[in-house]
């Protein structure tokens, strides 16, 4: 790894299949974070719903939900501090004032500092026969929260958001170099192809890195990956429970943008829809 000197920074995707045993999920997060750190990673991205997951949402999700600052984020903070790495993971967040629905939230955890950024999923998975919105409340449209690690600026988005290019465009416009994308990309006909195309497109059209961590099978599609600003997969995992590490750098982003200055040449900005359910 000595060839990657200067501002290069090692990041990892961690792929596993979270379940209904919250203690087991945390133990697997700790194991995979340690494995990634041993391979040189300084930031590790875990899947959506890493704190708790069942294939069919129900009242158990409300019971398993936690506030930010609760046991799950406290445990992540302890792991991050012990290993000296940043962690990004999805969790089920308890929302005040809503007795049924929870938040599908991603948190970024820094060593010694705890939560440094958070994101509530904007676009819920009401597609392909699923109705995530029955049990999950959408996040509010707000300025993207970024955090910095190793001189690299990171943003957050979640799973189904990948089908909405405006989400990633707002993140790159806020100044991010990398978008971390925890996911629970459900398997199905052509779904693996959709996952690869969309993840690659978000990296290529924004000339930024995408670090996309999915659930391992049998429910998730696997295929967690890190894609560079030219749309090249520089680290991938197939179906295994594992981690994959790659180097990211602002120099690579700048070099790609000199060749492909699409962001500078565009003629449109992203604005929020006034009536998002009008069509």
PLM regions with names:
Residues 89-91, 104-108, 145, 224-226, ...:
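Short beta-strand scaffold segments in enzyme catalytic cores
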Residues 68-88, 162-244:
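CN hydrolase (nitrilase-like) catalytic-core segments centered on the catalytic cysteine
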Residues 251-279:
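A short C-terminal boundary segment appended to hydrolase-like catalytic domains
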Residues 1-43:
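N-terminal glycine-/serine-/threonine-rich phosphate-binding loop
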Residues 2-11, 146-155, 178:
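Beta-strand-turn-beta hairpins that frame and shape the catalytic cleft
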Residues 15-17, 47, 120, 214:
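Residue-level recognition of beta-strand->loop/alpha-helix junctions
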Residues 22, 30-112, 118, 186-205:
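Cys-nucleophile CN-hydrolase/nitrilase-fold catalytic domain and related Cys-dependent amidase chemistry
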Residues 97-174, 187-197, 201, 258-262, ...:
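Active-site catalytic loop in hydrolytic enzyme cores
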